[in-house]
């Protein structure tokens, strides 16, 4: 018999110490990685529930195992909530990650050797949009589009030119490091002109879309995927939305082609996050996310730093560090010493290697969850600029760390 007294602390003290260390790090460091956020206690409670014990291969009402009456309710709640949030015809909440959701779309729309057109990783795209090191770039003939050199905005003319030249069967829109609004309808027209499918990966923008602060690609694209963490603030996982005609093929692409049993405890946590995302509080939160990002970008520009594309319309932006003669790697390391976490990130036409880079990516979702507003975001941006102006000055790093920890103490992630 399992005893409820056998807690993690007593069963595995080594692991417990690592988790406690991570808890302390999250409380004492300012998190600016654009793809990270803090899940609510309710989301984490669902993910840590007895649902982790249940196998449920198949879909609601059509399982290969018995005893699925309650997990059917859980999964259907998640499906219905996504459908309502994004006005989707078809929804699959089983993908274990955004990458697996994307793979399912490729399996549905393409055959090995078919051509896809996606945003270049070097210009802000994602690995799964046809990068040569990823499965999407190995199995399929991947062609890449990028940004205009003069404005650093998406080059829709190039997308159209490449589409007509290469005749891809699938066009991929979406990005992991692009700060401006993407014109889904313009992509739709380009796809229609050559008879291609349009696939939108809105992983970074989904929370903003749910709140009405970023255009909704659902109903415009043939396929839409997203992660469920990032701006959606749920557990780590993926979802797929599509036109109803693709239901059978997409369901099969997830199970049995790429996955076995769904993670029912994660699907439950997703369902909680989707309910939270339908609230007015969440809408207000997403508005503040954008306000905070814009304030930080403006202050950094005033401090002499260059923002890629010149501005942000969403939760994130890239900082070009070349004028400061430091690399993204150096900047991220110095900021971490100062209790501020960012990720090094390539900028368009970056001369540095991918593990070094000439930029950093800054995102506002996590700090906004903590309660930061414009005042704190302005203060934080000045702290970042202080570090970037003197990345090797220990006295500066120590002082910034002191102020960062004070901000964290004022705005704890998990109170009580």
UniProtKB/Swiss-Prot annotation:
Its cofactor is pyridoxal 5'-phosphate. The record marks 229 as: Plays an important role in substrate specificity. It comes from Nitrosospira multiformis (strain ATCC 25196 / NCIMB 11849 / C 71). The modification N6-(pyridoxal phosphate)lysine is found at residue 230. Catalyzes the reversible interconversion of serine and glycine with tetrahydrofolate (THF) serving as the one-carbon carrier. This reaction serves as the major source of one-carbon groups required for the biosynthesis of purines, thymidylate, methionine, and other important biomolecules. Also exhibits THF-independent aldolase activity toward beta-hydroxyamino acids, producing glycine and aldehydes, via a retro-aldol mechanism. It is an enzyme of class 2 (transferase). This is Serine hydroxymethyltransferase. InterPro entries: PyrdxlP-dep_Trfase, PyrdxlP-dep_Trfase_major, PyrdxlP-dep_Trfase_small, Ser_HO-MeTrfase, Ser_HO-MeTrfase-like, Ser_HO-MeTrfase_PLP_BS, SHMT-like_dom.
């Amino acid at each position: 018999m399992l005893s409820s007294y056998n807690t993690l602390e007593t069963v595995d003290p080594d692991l417990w110490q690592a988790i406690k260390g991570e808890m302390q790090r999250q409380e004492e460091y300012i998190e600016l990685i654009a793809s990270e956020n803090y899940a609510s206690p309710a989301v984490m409670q669902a993910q840590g529930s007895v649902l982790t014990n249940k196998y449920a291969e198949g879909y609601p009402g059509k399982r290969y195992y018995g005893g699925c009456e309650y997990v059917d309710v859980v999964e259907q709640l998640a499906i219905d909530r996504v459908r309502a949030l994004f006005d989707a015809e078809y929804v699959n909440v089983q993908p274990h990650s955004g990458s697996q959701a994307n793979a399912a779309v490729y399996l549905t729309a393409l055959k090995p050797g078919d051509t896809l057109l996606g945003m270049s990783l070097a210009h802000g795209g994602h690995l799964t949009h046809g990068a040569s090191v990823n499965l999407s770039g190995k199995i399929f003939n991947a062609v890449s589009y990028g940004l205009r050199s003069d404005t650093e905005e998406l080059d829709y003319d190039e997308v159209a030119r490449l589409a007509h030249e290469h005749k891809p069967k699938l066009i991929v829109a979406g990005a992991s490091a692009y700060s401006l609004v993407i014109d889904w309808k313009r992509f739709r027209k380009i796809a229609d002109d050559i008879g291609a499918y349009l696939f939108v990966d809105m992983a970074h923008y989904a929370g903003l879309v749910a709140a009405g602060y970023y255009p909704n690609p659902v109903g415009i694209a043939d396929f839409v995927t997203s992660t469920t963490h990032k701006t959606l603030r749920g557990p780590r996982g993926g979802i797929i939305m599509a036109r109803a005609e693709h239901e059978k093929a997409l369901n099969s692409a997830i199970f049995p082609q790429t996955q076995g049993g769904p993670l029912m405890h994660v699907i439950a946590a997703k369902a909680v996050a989707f309910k939270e995302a339908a609230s007015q509080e969440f809408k207000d939160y997403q508005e503040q996310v954008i306000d905070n990002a814009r304030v930080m970008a403006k202050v950094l520009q005033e401090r002499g730093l260059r923002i890629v594309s010149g501005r942000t319309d969403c939760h994130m932006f890239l900082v070009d560090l070349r004028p400061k003669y430091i690399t993204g790697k150096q900047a991220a390391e110095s900021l971490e010493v100062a209790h501020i976490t960012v990720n090094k990130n390539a900028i368009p036409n970056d001369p540095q290697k991918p593990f070094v880079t000439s930029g950093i990516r800054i995102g506002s979702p996590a700090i906004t969850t903590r309660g930061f507003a414009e005042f704190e975001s302005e203060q934080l941006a000045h702290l970042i600029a202080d570090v970037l102006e003197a990345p090797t000055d220990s006295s500066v790093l120590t002082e910034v760390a002191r102020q960062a920890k004070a901000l964290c103490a004022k705005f704890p992630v998990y109170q009580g």
